[in-house]
Every structure is written in C-alpha cells, then in structure tokens.
Amino acid sequence: MRLEKEKELKSILKLLAPGTQLREGLENILRAKTGGLIVLGDSEQILKVVDGGFAINSEYSPSYIYELAKMDGAIILSSDLKKILYANTQLIPDSTIPTFETGTRHRTADRVAKQTGVIVIAISQRRNVITVYRGHIKYVLRDSSVMLGRANQALQTLEKYVAVLDRVVNNLNILEFQDIVTLFDVMTAIQRTEMVMRIVSEIEIYICELGNEGRLISMQLNELIKSVERDGIFMIRDYCQTDMDYDEIYRQIQEISSDDVLNLDFISRAMGYVGVPLVDTLISPRGYRMLSKIPRIPATVMDNLVKNFKELKEIMEASYEDLDRVEGIGEARARAIKNGLRRLREQIMIDNKF
C-alpha cells in the first residue's frame, strides 16, 4: 500500500533490472560509450512526436539495439519490448513543456516522457550514466555493486528499527490486555511501524534495481518484516476515530514528510485526534489486531465481533453464549476465539517476564 509513485518506480525498475534482455542491451551501449535515446512504447501519442528515421520491425536483441545506437537518432521499441520498430528517428516533443535537464538528449527524453507518459531512457555518452524518465519520474540507474552495498547497509538499519518496533509493540500488547493504553503508546507504535515501512520501501527499490542479484536481499527482508505492515493497518483500525476510513488514514500517514513523522502530533491528527493530550488520554482497542492473531478467523467475523462488542475488553469478557450469538460464529468458533485470546494473553505475559 505504499504510495503510487513508488509502485510505479518499482514496476519501471523491474523492466530494466540486471538479467533482463533490455538491461543487457543498455549495458552494451553504456560500455561502447556511444550514448543513446530509447523509447519503450509505440502508441499513437509517441508516433506523433517521431520524425524521420527508418522502420526496422525486427525482433529485439541486445546486440541489435547496440548496433542501432551507433546512429544519432532515437530507437523506438514496441510496448511489449519484443520488437525494435524504428531507429535513427528524431523526437520532436512540445518545447513548452518545462525541463531542468541540460543535455539535448536528456531534455528531449524528459519532455517526451512528460508528454506521452511512456518510459524513455537516455544514455549519456560522456558521463556513462543511464537515466530513466516516465511522466514526472526521473531515476538514474546505478552499478549493481553500489546498489548491493546500499541494500546491505539499509538492511542493517532496518534490523535496528525492527528491534525497537518489537519492544514498542510488545509493550502495547501488555497494555491492551490490561486495558490501560494511552494515545501516546498507540501513536508511538504507529510511528515506529511507518518508519520501518519507509526503510522497507527503500530496500524494495534496491531489490527491483538489482534484479536477479537481489534475491538474497529479498529473502532477508521478508524474514525481517513478516507482518509489520498488516499489523500497522490493524493498529489504525483499532484506534482511529469512529467512521474514519482506515485506508485513507494510512495513505495520509505515508504522505507525512520524514521530518514530520518524528512528531506524534501529525500522526494523531491523521487518526482524528486534534488537540488531545497524548500521554493522559486512555483509549481502548477495538480488537482487530489481537483477533487477527487467532488462526482461521475470517475478516467478516472480526468485523461482526467489533460491531457487536465495540472493544477488545468486551470481547474477552463475553461468554461463549454471547460470542455464539454473533453472526458467523458457531459454538466451535466461539470456543476458538475465547481460548485463542486467553492463550495470547498468557503468552504475552510470559514473554514479558523473560
């Protein structure tokens, strides 16, 4: 559920990742120091800005694109990247589109990407750099060894952040079962979850850019984060003001700047608490997060439980008969919920002692 721009960037990087035919062709052009301008798409919008050149209409191969890049013009690939359609073309985008790029090749690439919304790749002849444009996204591809170093460094940072998050969440677990949670405890847990997810998002971009070289990083990442984002969303559902859309709240929290996310007031405002003293305000969870930890409890049953009992405390104090009366819960499931919550509480208290 990360922001759309990040999702779009990841999808672009997957197309250009090491190990793909496209990336092999780009690396060949880079090593030859010829420079190049490549458009990934053949829609009507693109063909409107294409002038001159000649039709190739041949199967894509890294060696073909390398040879064609020796000519000055742009190369047009089909949308599925399987064919080279045109070579040595001139691109004539709308000159009124603003761009802050300097070289002719990069200015053209930026304008074409903004005008058509397709991926345009500019390979610098002098600086030996591959730059990718799409809409208002600009990304410079880096060497795999540099990316691996950055990814490993980010993983080490993530490990420390996850350790802090675990302590904060364990504390929240105990307070929830004792029904003495304050807004400060909740906002701290949500803040820590968001900080972890921001590092995760950064590492995911590195993994996309590394392609098949990022497998080990991906495995380590999955082992570290497990259900962090899901639990964070359940926290929002547990504590946001009634009738607020939790997806919208999560989106707002993601949009908070890196500096402002350190301030709990920004998070509490997104959750619907304005001008409320965080440390002194007690609040009870609805119970989504704890119920999600009980095996084989569908989302509809969780919704029905929260609708009927309002708070986790009430669900825990309900008898088997009370639970049985809730829609979607029979005798067996009532027992599973009651026993599941009891075991969860015991486990959390035991873990805290050690």
UniProtKB/Swiss-Prot annotation:
GO terms for molecular function: adenylate cyclase activity; ATP binding; diadenylate cyclase activity; DNA binding. It holds the Pfam family HHH_2. Its EC number is 2.7.7.85. The keyword Phosphoprotein does not apply. Its cofactor is Mg(2+). It catalyses: 2 ATP = 3',3'-c-di-AMP + 2 diphosphate. InterPro entries: DisA, DisA/LigA_HHH, DisA_sf, DNA_integrity_DisA_N_sf, DNA_integrity_scan_DisA_link, DNA_integrity_scan_DisA_N, DNA_integrity_scanning_protein, RuvA_2-like. It comes from the Bacteria. Keywords: ATP-binding, DNA damage, DNA repair, DNA-binding, Magnesium, Nucleotide-binding, Nucleotidyltransferase, Transferase. The keyword Nucleotide-binding applies. One of its GO terms (biological process) is DNA repair. ATP binds at G73, L91, T104, R105, H106, R107, T108. PROSITE patterns: DAC. Participates in a DNA-damage check-point that is active prior to asymmetric division when DNA is damaged. DisA forms globular foci that rapidly scan along the chromosomes during sporulation, searching for lesions. When a lesion is present, DisA pauses at the lesion site. This triggers a cellular response that culminates in a temporary block in sporulation initiation. NCBIfam families: PRK13482.1 (NF010009). Belongs to the DisA family. PANTHER family: DIADENYLATE CYCLASE, DNA INTEGRITY SCANNING PROTEIN DISA. Homooctamer. This is DNA integrity scanning protein DisA.
